[in-house]
Amino acid sequence: MENKKSFFHLHLISDSTGETLMSAGRAVSAQFHTSMPVEHVYPMIRNQKQLAQVIDLIDKEPGIVLYTIVDQQLAEFLDLRCHAIGVPCVNVLEPIIGIFQTYLGAPSRRRVGAQHALNADYFARIEALNFAMDHDDGQMPETYDDADVVIIGISRTSKTPTSIYLANRGIKTANIPVVPNVPLPESLYAATRPLIVGLVATSDRISQVRENRDLGTTGGFDGGRYTDRATIMEELKYARALCARNNWPLIDVTRRSIEETAAAILALRPRTR
């Protein structure tokens, strides 16, 4: 029988695409087989206003914070705020930059995204990342037909991290929460361009992830129904029926990593063209 895994929040903050952070976070997370990260990815964070909004989200769902921000004032602001709310915060690149500076006897350029060549592929990824952030969690439904992929699913089926992962590969991705008896936007049904795909998981997996969210939430949140397995099963039944009715493919993410889920979505795309 498979051991029950625990979940923790992993916040990844980058002033560029976030790809470096995602690779580092997953490489380390893979060393801890009994715990699985709930990833929160925040790319293109380049000013204090954006960073303050991210910190508010971290405060609601505390966990490990990894970041790659070359602006030292922003990095110090993040460090101070994370210390104030009691969460660990690590600048992933800073120790490496320090070693390079010492060995080479020269300061770094401190340039955002310096590891990326400024070619068409890079700009396509930036455009896709901006699109994914603008269309996260049901936002901007009027432009769904501009998407390459639209992901739908109930809460805690990895919609956002999958969207960001696809965006890092230049795939414009929107995601929409599925809530029983709440109609999806008409613009989704009218869209002819994107692949629309549903994500599901077992009720046990979703309940475990939601329980972790509940524990990290300060007052005013009634997690009873949110984490109740019977309620989750009804949500999943509704989502499955919705996808079946519209001939939208379903992917079960229970035992899939974000990379595997994204690969499964990409494998479906040629059939839709």
From Swiss-Prot:
Parts of the chain that traverse the membrane: none
Name of the top EC class for this enzyme: transferase
Keywords of this entry: Kinase, Nucleotide-binding, Serine/threonine-protein kinase, Transferase
Pfam families, per the entry: Kinase-PPPase
Residue numbers binding ADP: G153, I154, S155, R156, T157, S158, K159, T160
SS bond partners: none
Catalysed conversion reaction: N(tele)-phospho-L-histidyl/L-threonyl-[pyruvate, phosphate dikinase] + ADP = N(tele)-phospho-L-histidyl/O-phospho-L-threonyl-[pyruvate, phosphate dikinase] + AMP + H(+); N(tele)-phospho-L-histidyl/O-phospho-L-threonyl-[pyruvate, phosphate dikinase] + phosphate + H(+) = N(tele)-phospho-L-histidyl/L-threonyl-[pyruvate, phosphate dikinase] + diphosphate
InterPro entries (UniProt xref): Kinase-pyrophosphorylase (IPR005177), PPDK_reg (IPR026565)
Keyword hit for Nuclease: no
The enzyme's E.C. designation: 2.7.11.32, 2.7.4.27
GO molecular function, one term: protein serine/threonine kinase activity
Family: Belongs to the pyruvate, phosphate/water dikinase regulatory protein family. PDRP subfamily.
Function, as annotated: Bifunctional serine/threonine kinase and phosphorylase involved in the regulation of the pyruvate, phosphate dikinase (PPDK) by catalyzing its phosphorylation/dephosphorylation.
Full protein name: Putative pyruvate, phosphate dikinase regulatory protein
Lineage, highest ranks first: Bacteria, Pseudomonadati, Pseudomonadota, Alphaproteobacteria, Hyphomicrobiales
